[in-house]
Amino acid sequence: MKRFQKKCTLFLLLIGLGLSALHAQSYDKLWKQVEQAQKKSLPQTVIKLTGEIYQKAEKEKNAPQMLKATIYRDTYQEKLTPDSLYANLKNMEFWAQSEQNPVNKAILHSLLAREYADYMQSNRAVLMNRIALDINEIPADIREWTITQFVAKIDEHNCASLQDSINL
């Protein structure tokens, strides 16, 4: 009887490992398709495939794949439609606020800090000439922010990414 239980346990373990290997293979297959679409300069295909990867990863609660898919998808969306940056930032802000895993939350806050810093740097000339009308009220649209508001937002996300650093 014990021998049978060991065999059953071993069998279930092998099935579990096999399923996780299948998941990894399916991600590998999808990422290879993304790579081929990149080489062929097919941004719409990259966006579609990374959207599929994101949905699959979300169902499986696979945060690393979700993050990777988000970064790729957002990058290609912004190349096609630069205004998508603003929606992408809002989505990532929501994700960072609702994320329960401290490691994933820290990564998201770090990515957000980088995105805001990159935006600030690429629009520095315009921002330097902008006059703050009401410092206490931050506009919903980042295109209306002052450089001070960007610095505060970047600092907020950097601090949030390090908030649980002892446990990370």
Model region roles, listed by residue range:
Residues 27-33, 37-168:
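Extracytoplasmic/secretory-pathway proteins
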Residues 1-30:
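Bacterial Sec-dependent N-terminal signal peptides
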